[in-house]
From Swiss-Prot:
This is Tyrosine-protein kinase JAK3. The lineage of its organism: Eukaryota, Metazoa, Chordata, Craniata, Vertebrata. Non-receptor tyrosine kinase involved in various processes such as cell growth, development, or differentiation. Mediates essential signaling events in both innate and adaptive immunity and plays a crucial role in hematopoiesis during T-cells development. In the cytoplasm, plays a pivotal role in signal transduction via its association with type I receptors sharing the common subunit gamma such as IL2R, IL4R, IL7R, IL9R, IL15R and IL21R. Belongs to the protein kinase superfamily. Tyr protein kinase family. JAK subfamily. Residues 24-353 form the FERM domain.
């Protein structure tokens, strides 16, 4: 056993078994540091928070506060984990044994290539864990293996792997104890480092075999000890090898049930590298539901059961596109264990300030929230934030110490003769909970009181006066060293600040011809528009499609606002969400006309005026929550709306008969950034106060203010009295930081007050707003709706039936509910249409892309079914998502249903936005496409049609591979296949062996990827496209078929020319991809880190 150190617990160690006879005690076991029993901390009678116990254990193990969030407490058999907020009550006869373990895992912990902690610059990133955590993780893994907790196989190969792990274990012991291998093996048996089942196998061998195995271990141990690797490198190797052998050890699986049914239980699996997956029954084939950044909210409710099963809990996870996963857990502890796991991963990956529900919220985080205190961020991030705030003297940041659990750090900006400087003060918290700061005469009961005492205390730090004036409070989604960046996962969108600065708001929309529009009655006027009801008619393949539309005509008197009006149209045309109004396009004939879907019940403010007291509080809560979902979607995209009010919220479905109401947020219209002060004053109280201060930028926080005012309007049944005041009195209301009258529901009034905080930095994120609304919906606020006895209240659904249960596959779309909207694309083999799947017939269903064949012969149907099966099996951030299929009558026809990405294909996107897409963005796209192709290759899938036209754009920073019509799966045991019926092919993207012999492989896809790189860096300019360049090389008097001439050119070594602005390193990669021999081309797994390194090395 290792000698005592400063990490050894101060409490004496006694029994560590659940069967301990000691009464009235709680024991927290720590992983053993070597052979022997585990260390433990013991606590006597009283109440203990799980998070406080974790802090005590972290201090004993030397775990710093930065890494505290990786750990949690579990029962001794690991059947249940406890959220940080759990309270353990120890009474006279109780004895509880807990285990302190690292719960949150990430792929390839070590180094910076796969995952790392966020840094201000790409060269300032740091590893996820430090040496103390590494040591703890090693002890945890080693204990699991040698105790028999991990299931192990006993094939000859696996026996060799475990013997290798034993050698690494012995080598690190030799390093720690400074012993030679021979000396170590006199006191420690190599079999003590093996799983029990393998120990038994070896013990059952004859003497000669046991001696041979021991000699092999000794020789291997001498070789390892002779190398230069230190103890920590040996530990890291041990951990990586064990996680490679047992990847399930880094995931957690939960057995769940389908609500309202008595079927076989399903399985939920949570993993740090890909989020939540599910499987029906006991099948081990898991389907991905969502990654952590896609989660919008999580809620826990009592399951709708009666009788003995009343303890069951229903957990609902809502993802960004509106689909939900509902899973029924046998009890509250299991449900909280699952939610705490998802909650913890979300904080580590997405937002260190967020928690999904109060039942699992870490108490230390709640304390930080109340005190406007940051977590244990480093000094670099604190100074960076003060600089971003303008480096104003007196601004300060309060943060937890990254080194000490009982200390806080005050970092403030002070004025010196040389300019602004940054000084720090240490705040200590004593065991009684009092806070003290050197220079203050007495301790204070809270941080808030201590800081108030600092404001006019005359404190000096290093000779500089410390006069605090304003606090830089924590903000949602702030990037810091507390965030883990996972390479190869969907990039988080950057915070949006202004439509003019936002990527998606570049003018880009579908143009609608005048003769396709039919005008009906006038519906009134907007601030800048005349509004008409109308009809849009489109003819596709001789078939006429009619859609009822709303026509917004820009008033000619407001020509100066035309650009902002078109920016709003562009924004709405490039987003797709159930609770956002669909924009068909813009008609530019004479006046600018925005063509939108027609929402039948109109604006919700008018509806509330008509219905008055007949509208229940429960109905209003659901409407408010749906609005929050829409604004959360825009917030995640970094897109401010800027004009949130009840008149912009349209009611698509009234609700009733078990269905909830359904709203859609309309376009923002003209942005506040171009309006005069008089017009902005007219929008009080919906416009945020900062928008009146001649600001030329519109930030996301403005929408929180508008949401608060709209929520007040919805629950009050009409606009606030302030709307009828004179302009001067309205402005005075803002100058005095007035508040709207408080609603009678205290919690809702508090939420509105938070949203309408005059300091934009104090307003909550929409995820936090949704969390608080969930608390209202699942509380006694439902009683206010006064439902009729015997009639069930409407479900709290996001998208009107778009649910995904843990044990149910929602892959069949009824053809009659697919409503055609427009044609997205048409090729030689099929067409893709934009449709709305609308089973309720009220235009509330989700938008989807639907692919169907042009010709439906038996061969085409077979190939189409193969394409569907391939896409269905793929789950990657960089491949378009499969949604399901739709069958015609008698299953005579088949359609593929996919996610709809409104930004279109990469080819058109590059052509439209060439001026603002710089090299770093092109490299990001290239890396993402390469990662997607690497994923396909690992699944033996050859795409065969990789080109920019078949890459779809989800956002300014995210692309996905699509169109698997030509894709093939490689036969087992083969690295290529030969196409017998090649048909029409994109020859200018094909490798030589594909052109001459119809041979396709992962290497032929690499050739096509080289052509895609060429397309990226030429911005898909038609004048220098691959086909145009090769035809130019062939000359005007070319003889024979183009394919033969192309083969001759390639055999002569002719290749596409280097694009003018392409970096030399990318040109070299292109040439490697175009090597004549397939074996000389790099694999996607080799190209991916090279492109990643190029992208990370670019400025910005």
């Amino acid at each position: 056993m290792a000698p005592p150190s400063e990490e050894t617990p101060l409490i004496p160690q006694r029994s560590c078994s659940l069967s301990s006879s000691e009464a009235g005690a709680l024991h927290v076991l720590l992983p053993p540091r070597g052979p022997g029993p585990p260390q433990r901390l013991s606590f006597s009678f009283g109440d203990y928070l799980a998070e406080d116990l974790c802090v005590r254990a972290a201090k004993a193990c030397g775990i710093l506060p930065v890494y505290h969030s990786l750990f949690a407490l579990a029962t001794e058999d690991f059947s249940c984990w406890f959220p940080p907020s759990h309270i353990f009550c120890i009474e006279d006869v109780d004895t509880q044994v807990l285990v302190y373990r690292l719960r949150f895992y990430f792929p390839d912990w070590f180094g910076l290539e796969t995952c790392h902690r966020f840094g201000l610059r790409k060269d300032l990133t740091s590893a996820i864990l430090d040496l103390h955590v590494l040591e703890h993780l090693f002890a945890q893994h080693r204990s699991d293996l040698v105790s028999g907790r991990l299931p192990v196989g006993l094939s000859m190969k696996e026996q060799g792997e475990f013997l290798s792990l034993a050698v690494l274990d012995l080598a690190q012991m030799a390093r720690e104890q400074a012993q030679r291998p021979g000396e170590l093996l006199k006191t420690v048996s190599y079999k003590a480092c093996l799983p029990p089942s393998l120990r038994d196998v070896i013990q059952g061998q004859n003497f000669v075999t046991r001696r041979r195995i021991r000699r092999t271990v000794v020789l291997a141990l001498r070789r390892v000890v002779a190398c230069q690797a230190d103890r920590y490198a040996l530990m890291a190797k041990y951990i990586l090898d064990l996680e490679r052998l047992h990847p399930a050890a880094t995931t957690e699986t939960f057995r769940v049930g389908l609500p309202g049914a008595q079927e076989e239980p399903g399985l939920l699996r949570v993993a740090g590298d890909n989020g939540i997956s599910w499987s029906s029954g006991d099948q081990e084939l898991f389907q991905t539901f969502c990654d952590f950044p896609e989660i919008v909210d999580v809620s826990i409710k009592q399951a709708p059961r009666v009788g003995p099963a009343g303890e069951h809990r229903l957990v609902t996870v809502t993802r960004m596109d509106g689909h939900i996963l509902e899973a029924e857990f046998p009890g509250l502890p299991e449900a909280l264990s699952f939610v705490a796991l998802v909650d913890g991963y979300f904080r580590l990956i997405c937002d260190s300030r967020h928690y999904f529900c109060k039942e699992v919220a870490p108490p230390r985080l709640l304390e930080e929230e109340a005190e406007l205190c940051h977590g244990p961020i480093t000094l670099d991030f604190a100074i960076h934030k003060l600089k971003a705030a303008g480096s104003l003297p007196g601004t300060y940041i309060l943060r937890r110490s990254p080194q000490d659990y009982d200390s806080f750090l005050l970092t403030a900006c002070v004025q010196t003769p040389l300019g602004p400087d940054y000084k720090g003060c240490l705040i200590r918290q004593d065991p009684s909970g009092a806070f003290s700061l050197v220079g203050l005469s007495q301790p204070h009961r809270s941080l808030r009181e201590l800081l108030a005492a600092c404001w006019n205390s005359g404190l000096r730090v290093d000779g500089a006066a410390l006069n605090l004036t304003s606090c830089c409070a924590p903000r949602p989604k702030e990037k810091s060293n507390l965030i883990v960046v996972r390479r190869g996962c969907t990039p988080a969108p950057a915070p949006g600040c202004s439509p003019s600065c936002c990527a998606l708001t570049q003018l880009s929309f579908h143009t609608i011809p005048t003769d396709s529009l039919e005008w009906h009655e006038n519906l009134g006027h907007g601030s800048f528009t005349k509004i008409f009801r109308g009809r849009r008619r489109e003819v596709v393949d001789g078939e006429t499609h009619d859609s009822e539309v709303l026509l917004k005509v820009m008033d000619s008197r407001h020509r100066n606002c035309m650009e902002s009006f078109l920016e709003a149209a562009s924004l709405m045309s490039q987003v797709s969400y159930p609770h956002l109004v669909l924009l068909h396009g813009v008609c530019m004939a004479g006046d600018s006309i925005m063509v939108q879907e027609f929402v039948y019940l109109g604006a919700i403010d008018m509806y509330l005026r008509k219905r008055g007291h007949l509208v229940s509080a429960s109905w209003k809560l659901q409407v408010t929550k749906q609005l929050a979902y829409a604004l959360n979607y825009l917030e995640d995209k970094g897109l401010p709306h800027g004009n949130v009010s009840a008149r912009k919220v349209l009611l698509a479905r009234e609700g009733g008969d078990g269905n909830p109401p359904f709203i859609k947020l309309s376009d923002p219209g003209v942005s506040p950034t171009v309006l005069s002060l008089e017009m902005l004053t007219d929008r009080i109280p919906w416009v945020a106060p900062e928008c009146l201060q001649e600001a030329q930028t519109l930030c996301l926080e403005a929408d929180k203010w508008g949401f608060g005012a709209t929520t007040w309007e919805v629950f009050s049944g009409g606009p606030a009295h302030i709307t009828s005041l004179e302009p001067a009195k309205k402005l005075k209301f803002y100058e005095d930081q007035g508040q709207l009258p408080a609603l009678k529901w205290t919690e809702l009034a508090g939420l509105i007050t938070q949203c309408m905080a005059y300091d934009p930095g104090r307003r909550p994120s929409f995820r936090a707003i949704l969390r608080d609304l969930n608390g209202l919906i699942t509380s006694d606020y439902e009683l206010l709706s006064d439902p009729t006895p015997g009639i069930p209240s409407p479900r709290d659904e996001l998208c009107g039936g778009a649910q995904l249960y843990a044990c149910q596959d929602p892959a069949i779309f009824e053809e009659r509910h697919l409503k055609y909207i427009s044609l997205l694309g048409k090729g030689n083999f099929g067409s893709v249409e934009l449709c709305r799947y609308d089973p309720l017939g009220d235009n509330t269903g989700p938008l989807v892309a639907v692919k169907q064949l042009q010709h439906s012969g038996p061969d085409q149907q077979r190939d189409f079914q193969r394409e569907i099966q391939i896409l269905k099996a793929l789950h990657s951030d960089f491949i378009v998502k499969y949604r399901g299929v739709s069958y015609g009558p008698g299953r005579q026809s088949l359609r593929l249903v996919m996610e709809y990405l409104p930004s279109g294909c990469l080819r058109d996107f590059l052509q439209r936005h060439r001026a603002r897409l710089h090299t770093d963005r092109l490299l990001l796209f290239a890396w993402q496409i390469c990662k997607g192709m690497e994923y396909l290759g690992a699944r033996r899938c050859v795409h065969r049609d990789l080109a920019a036209r078949n890459i779809l754009v989800e956002s300014e920073a995210h692309v996905k591979i699509a169109d698997f019509g030509l894709a093939k799966l490689l036969p087992l045991g083969k690295d290529y296949y030969v196409v017998r019926e090649p048909g029409q092919s994109p020859i200018f993207w094909y490798a030589p062996e594909s052109l001459s012999d119809n041979i396709f492989s992962r290497q032929s896809d690499v050739w096509s990827f080289g052509v895609v790189l060429y397309e990226l860096f030429t911005y898909c300019d038609k004048s220098c496209s691959p086909s145009a360049e090769f035809l130019r090389m062939m000359g005007p008097e070319r003889e024979g078929p183009p394919l033969c001439r192309l083969l001759e050119l390639l055999a002569e070594g002719r290749r596409l020319p280097p694009p003018p602005t392409c970096p030399t390193e990318v040109q070299e990669l292109m040439q490697l991809c175009w090597a004549p021999s397939p074996h000389d081309r790099p694999a996607f797994g080799t190209l991916s880190p090279q492109l990643d390194a190029l992208w990370r090395g670019r400025p910005g």
